[in-house]
């Protein structure tokens, strides 16, 4: 049974988000907030992430990802709720 206190979001970040430390900064922020999941660069220039945690933790992470680190320029952020039983143990950069 899915834990109602755990939320999982799949996120796609568009803009100047590669070559600017976005993934590394995302991992640092995830550790600060206590969320789990992963982040990776995609061939089309976007960054994708899976973020899992309490609704409050996930909201704070999403808010940060809309801005990213200082060198990034996020133009669009897509997110969708994932309904799956997979639980992540840590936050990883791929």
Curated annotation (Swiss-Prot):
One of its GO terms (molecular function) is acylphosphatase activity. Belongs to the acylphosphatase family. It comes from the Bacteria. InterPro entries: Acylphosphatase, Acylphosphatase-like_dom, Acylphosphatase-like_dom_sf, Acylphosphatase_CS. Residues 77-86 have a biased composition (Basic and acidic residues). The active site is at 23, 41. Residues 8-94 form the Acylphosphatase-like domain. It holds the Pfam family Acylphosphatase. The keyword Hydrolase applies. Keywords: Hydrolase. Its EC number is 3.6.1.7. The keyword Hydrolase applies. This is Acylphosphatase. Residues 69-94 are annotated as: Disordered. It catalyses: an acyl phosphate + H2O = a carboxylate + phosphate + H(+).
């Amino acid at each position: 049974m899915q834990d109602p206190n755990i939320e999982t979001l799949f996120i796609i970040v568009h803009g100047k988000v590669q070559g600017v430390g976005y993934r590394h900064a995302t991992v640092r922020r995830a550790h600060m907030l206590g969320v789990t999941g992963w982040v990776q660069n995609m061939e089309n220039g976007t960054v994708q992430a899976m973020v899992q945690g309490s609704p409050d933790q996930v909201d704070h992470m999403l808010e940060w990802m809309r801005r990213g680190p200082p060198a990034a320029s996020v133009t669009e952020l897509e997110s969708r709720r994932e309904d799956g039983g997979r639980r992540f143990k840590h936050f990883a950069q791929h």
